[in-house]
A protein has these predicted regions:
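Soluble catalytic domains of membrane acyltransferases
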Residues: 2-202, 320-448
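Short, well-structured alpha-helical interface segments that form or flank functional binding sites
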Residues: 142, 206, 314
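Long, charge-rich alpha-helical interaction segments
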Residues: 202, 209-300
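Transmembrane alpha-helical segments and their cytosolic interface motifs
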Residues: 296-330
Length: 448
């Protein structure tokens, strides 16, 4: 691994594990075959760039190659060269890059197959596009074809392995949430070589079934997509927290919470008639949206004294928040602007890490270093450059404080609105419905 790649990986690790995520978990790292083994990692796609970075940062002994959407390679020749240096390969899609561009996938498949033959590790997302919900989409057989064709090029002398994996997020769109990467059991293609020689499609179908079953079993797969929002509300509501606590799940234990959520979703799926439950849940969801609050604000039931003390505290911290506007505002605003331009909320985290943390923060750091250093030198300050360096090194802490202050303000206003809701007639009606939903859920979970 060259120095540029190691520098990139180290900086990304600092920005993701140290700044972006509250906690990261990795389960089954011992299942990753040793370096030099041809491995194709197949994973669900629950986010955009963040998914790839999760695998990049949990496999430390080798350079991992990723097959990702091609549009980022088309920005400039420099971008194409840089991304390939990092191990990324472009996948062209008919609905994005056009029918003519799809033929370029031949080169990507060739490069990926050659990487496997050389004993390297390739990561692919068989769903092609990322999901916006906890659900496993349809798989393309492109990844199984790639693995078998790589084996065929070696005369079936090398055992290509497919490693099912999954990623799971405590929340998709919020900052300082948690990420879980889980590796399953490697699947050897060697037992399928003879079948592939006579019935290639059948061999691919059988392997795909095994891969998909493993990924589905590791992740939270809410298959009832039509009622997803209602199910997700129940899962993330105060009831979901209570249910997790009854399972012995700690507050920040994402792997255990995932298993608890899977049990809860399975209990709902086992019910024959949930139409009324889901209808009532959606009524609560729509009410909370209308009032611009979340279930957690209702659950907290903040007192007037708590609200007043928090308001005073935030007021006292406001001068510090004002001082932290630079570089925080461009670091937070640019990704939000770009995400809104795409119309895809899943890019929020990707742009925050991929643009702000990796590029914008470095550029702003250089600009600030030069401006402060030369500015203080011009004013005759004796230690101008050490001050400038110290200021730039504090950028991550400055950004975290600014985010925390804004987050505290947002939650304070939500809690204030929740107090108002609790005092209103329609709010009390909603609370009764909410408790009735939780009561029905208690009965469902106890019957399982």
């Amino acid at each position: 691994m060259n120095l540029l790649f190691l520098n990139f990986k180290g900086f990304v690790r600092l920005m993701t594990n140290g700044v972006y995520y509250k906690k990261t978990f990795c389960i089954g790292r011992e299942n990753v075959p040793e370096k030099g083994t041809p491995v194709l990692i197949a994973s669900n796609h629950q986010n955009a760039l963040n998914d790839a970075l999760g695998f990049l940062l949990t496999i430390n002994d080798r350079k991992v190659h990723f097959i990702v959407r091609a549009n980022v390679f088309l920005l400039a020749k420099a971008a194409d060269k840089y991304l390939r240096m990092l191990g990324l390969l472009p996948a062209f899609r008919m609905d994005h890059e056009g029918l003519n561009a799809v033929s370029n996938n031949g080169a990507t498949f060739h490069d990926s197959e050659e990487a496997l033959i050389e004993g390297k590790t390739v990561v692919i997302f068989p769903e092609a596009g990322h999901q916006w919900i906890h659900w496993l989409g349809n798989f393309s057989f492109g990844y199984t074809r790639m693995a078998f064709e790589a084996a065929e090029k070696t005369g079936f002398t090398k055992d290509i392995k497919i490693l099912p994996a999954c990623n799971h997020y405590s929340k998709y769109f919020d900052f300082k949430t948690s990420l879980l990467i889980r590796y399953g059991t490697p699947i050897s293609l060697e037992p399928y070589y003879d079948l592939y020689k006579v019935k290639p499609r059948t061999a691919q179908r059988e392997v795909n079934k095994l891969v998909r079953e493993q990924i589905s079993s590791m992740m939270l797969n809410i298959e009832d997509v039509d009622n997803y929002e209602a199910i997700d509300y129940i899962r993330t509501s105060e009831f979901g927290d209570r249910f997790a606590a009854s399972q012995g799940v700690g507050k920040d234990d994402l792997p255990a919470r995932l298993e608890s959520d899977k049990k809860l979703v399975a209990a709902l799926a086992a019910q024959e008639d949930t139409a009324k439950l889901y209808e009532d849940s959606m009524n609560v969801v729509e009410f909370l949206k209308k009032k611009r609050i979340e279930d957690v604000n209702i659950a907290k039931n903040s007192s007037a004294l708590s609200v007043a003390l928090r308001f005073i505290g935030l007021l006292l911290l406001s001068p510090m928040a004002l001082a932290c506007v630079w570089p925080s505002v461009p670091v937070w605003i640019i990704p939000r602007y770009l995400q809104k331009k795409t119309g895809d909320p899943m890019y929020r985290g990707s742009f925050l890490i991929g643009i702000s943390c990796i590029f914008t923060l470095r550029i702003l750091g250089l600009v600030t270093l030069l401006a402060v250093g030369f500015g203080l030198s011009f004013l005759g300050h004796a230690i101008s450059w050490p001050i400038a360096v110290a200021y730039v090194l504090l950028f991550p802490a400055i950004g975290l404080f600014e985010w925390a202050w804004c987050y505290w303000c947002r939650e304070l206003f939500r809690d204030m609105r929740a107090r108002k809701v609790r005092r209103s007639e329609d709010g009390r009606s909603m609370l009764r419905l909410r408790e009735d939903i939780f009561s029905r859920m208690d009965k469902i979970c106890k019957s399982e």
